[in-house]
A protein has these predicted regions:
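Tandem CBS (Cystathionine beta-synthase) repeat/Bateman regulatory domains
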Residues: 1-152
């Protein structure tokens, strides 16, 4: 099975891209969730949006990332079906901080997209929160980077 970061690495051009910075391609409409929110809230969000990463905050400061993959790993495949297990219902009552990725890699908006690509590939991650003076200003994903390399 090919991961998203492997796919990005396999499709990158051999020549450096035009000089774009993270701010040029990042998504600025970011959805956050609190560390102590329950996973049931994350489920409601993921069920109604097309993106796969929630930035986790504590007192408006980035604390982690909850990916859709992290969320699904915490649940059994029976969630939402007639065979839903008591364990699944209990799992949805867990707090976000119990499942999230702590201390995520981040990047600044002025950084070159090649730096972002290197971080994502080197650490096999799907996204980077974009921080400016410790304030969340956006998010950049491997799909954003792939589009930047090939969209003219």
């Amino acid at each position: 099975m090919t991961t998203s970061t492997e796919m990005l690495a396999e499709t990158l051009p051999d020549t450096p891209t035009k000089h774009l910075c993270v701010a040029d391609i990042m998504t600025t409409r970011v959805v956050t969730i609190e560390m102590d929110d329950r996973l049931i809230l994350a489920k409601e969000i993921f069920d109604n949006v097309s993106f796969h990463h929630l930035l986790v905050v504590d007192n408006e400061q980035l604390s982690g990332i909850l990916s859709h993959r992290d969320f699904l790993r915490a649940l059994s495949p029976n969630i939402g079906t007639a065979a839903e297990l008591i364990r699944d219902t209990e799992t949805l009552q867990k707090r976000v901080h119990q499942v999230m990725t702590h201390n995520p890699f981040t990047i600044a908006p002025h950084c070159d997209i090649n730096q972002a690509t290197k971080l994502i590939l080197d650490h096999d991650i799907g996204c980077l929160p974009v921080l400016d003076n410790n304030v969340i200003v956006g998010i950049i994903t491997w799909k954003d980077l792939l589009n930047a390399y090939y969209v003219k």
